[in-house]
């Protein structure tokens, strides 16, 4: 059996709060089940909170943003792994700013996608070897904000660069009366079957 390299990306900014992070807890639970099924796989953890070079794209750095070597570092990492597990809470109807900065670094023409040789003008993803699992959390019920679906956004983004995206795991409704009093471990119990099934199939 081939050893798979798995990159686990966390993007929550609330890990250090007393309440903790639901999305990071979801990632940890998913990986707990994944490790049981795949004990020899190599796990690489990337917490975006610790990456000081993931600064926002602005007029101050636009001219050098894609040529300063930072994008290549993260793109090369993606090229070196077989699977990616990425987690994010919903923040203001989107994924986190940390994750936005990361995506700005890896979405680079002719490195992760290309329009060259495209017959109909559509993009060709350059990372078809990747298998991606998206794990998200949100306070609102699924589909509540029709204009802000961070899960679908992430699915489309990774499909755009050629990755095979597994069915996402979404812990939704966490701010509704049914779940709002629960801490992360209790909420995870309610979604446990979905998480376990996804991990076993990834």
Swiss-Prot record:
Catalytic activity field: 2 a quinone + NADH + H(+) = 2 a 1,4-benzosemiquinone + NAD(+); N,N-dimethyl-1,4-phenylenediamine + anthranilate + 2 NAD(+) = 2-(4-dimethylaminophenyl)diazenylbenzoate + 2 NADH + 2 H(+)
Cofactor annotation: FMN
E.C. number: 1.6.5.-, 1.7.1.17
Free-text cofactor note: Binds 1 FMN per subunit.
Top EC class for this record: oxidoreductase
Amino acids binding FMN: 12, 21-23
GO molecular function annotation: electron transfer activity; FMN binding; oxidoreductase activity, acting on NAD(P)H as acceptor; oxidoreductase activity, acting on NAD(P)H, quinone or similar compound as acceptor
A Pfam family: Flavodoxin_2
Chain coiled-coil ranges: none
Gene3D superfamilies tied to this protein: 3.40.50.360
SUPFAM superfamilies: Flavoproteins (SSF52218)
Keywords: Flavoprotein, FMN, NAD, Oxidoreductase
Oligomeric and partner information: Homodimer.
Family: Belongs to the azoreductase type 1 family.
Function of the protein: Quinone reductase that provides resistance to thiol-specific stress caused by electrophilic quinones. Also exhibits azoreductase activity. Catalyzes the reductive cleavage of the azo bond in aromatic azo compounds to the corresponding amines.
Protein name: FMN-dependent NADH:quinone oxidoreductase
Organism: Mycoplasma mobile (strain ATCC 43663 / 163K / NCTC 11711)
């Amino acid at each position: 059996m081939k050893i798979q390299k798995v990159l686990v990306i966390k993007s929550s900014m609330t890990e250090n709060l007393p309440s903790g992070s639901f999305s990071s807890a979801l990632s940890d639970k998913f990986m707990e089940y994944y490790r049981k099924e795949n004990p020899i796989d190599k796990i690489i953890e990337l917490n975006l909170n610790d990456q000081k070079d993931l600064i926002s794209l602005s007029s101050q750095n636009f001219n050098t943003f894609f040529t300063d070597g930072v994008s290549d570092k993260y793109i090369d990492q993606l090229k070196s792994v077989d699977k990616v597990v990425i987690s994010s809470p919903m923040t203001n109807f989107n994924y986190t700013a940390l994750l936005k900065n990361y995506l700005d670094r890896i979405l680079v023409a002719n490195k992760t996608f290309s329009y060259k040789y495209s017959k109909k003008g559509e993009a060709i993803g350059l990372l078809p070897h990747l298998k991606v699992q998206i794990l998200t959390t949100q306070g609102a019920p699924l589909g509540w904000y029709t204009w802000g679906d961070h899960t679908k956004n992430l699915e489309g983004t990774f499909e755009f660069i050629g990755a095979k995206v597994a069915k996402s795991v979404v812990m939704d409704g966490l701010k509704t009366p049914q779940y709002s009093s629960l801490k992360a471990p209790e909420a995870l119990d309610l979604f446990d079957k979905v998480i376990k099934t996804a991990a076993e199939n990834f």
